[in-house]
């Protein structure tokens, strides 16, 4: 079966957990490196979601301006 798409909020929560675990300094260097790698991947996914949302909003705003001008 296909993978269920993770929500923005769930990814952000995972990232916050990773940051907190790295901040407390109680994990090994190896675990820190794994967490860092996972955190970077999550950051990239979150950035993409935000950029996609920004693009959709821009399209909606542009369409709204066109509708207003044609009224």
Swiss-Prot record:
Signal peptide: none annotated. One of its GO terms (biological process) is DNA catabolic process. Keywords: Cytoplasm, Exonuclease, Hydrolase, Nuclease. It is an enzyme of class 3 (hydrolase). It is found in: Cytoplasm. GO terms for cellular component: cytosol; exodeoxyribonuclease VII complex. It catalyses: Exonucleolytic cleavage in either 5'- to 3'- or 3'- to 5'-direction to yield nucleoside 5'-phosphates. Its EC number is 3.1.11.6. The keyword Hydrolase applies. It comes from the Bacteria. GO terms for molecular function: exodeoxyribonuclease VII activity. InterPro entries: Exonuc_VII_S, Exonuc_VII_ssu_sf. Its main location: cytoplasm. The keyword Nuclease applies. Heterooligomer composed of large and small subunits. Bidirectionally degrades single-stranded DNA into large acid-insoluble oligonucleotides, which are then degraded further into small acid-soluble oligonucleotides. Belongs to the XseB family. This is Exodeoxyribonuclease 7 small subunit. It comes from Clostridium botulinum (strain Loch Maree / Type A3). The gene is xseB.
């Amino acid at each position: 079966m296909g993978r269920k798409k993770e929500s923005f909020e769930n990814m952000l929560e995972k990232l916050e957990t990773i940051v907190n675990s790295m901040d407390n300094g109680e994990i090994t260097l190896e675990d820190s490196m794994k967490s860092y790698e996972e955190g970077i991947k999550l950051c990239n996914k979150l950035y993409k979601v935000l950029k996609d949302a920004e693009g959709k909003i821009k399209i909606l705003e542009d369409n709204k301006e066109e509708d207003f001008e044609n009224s």
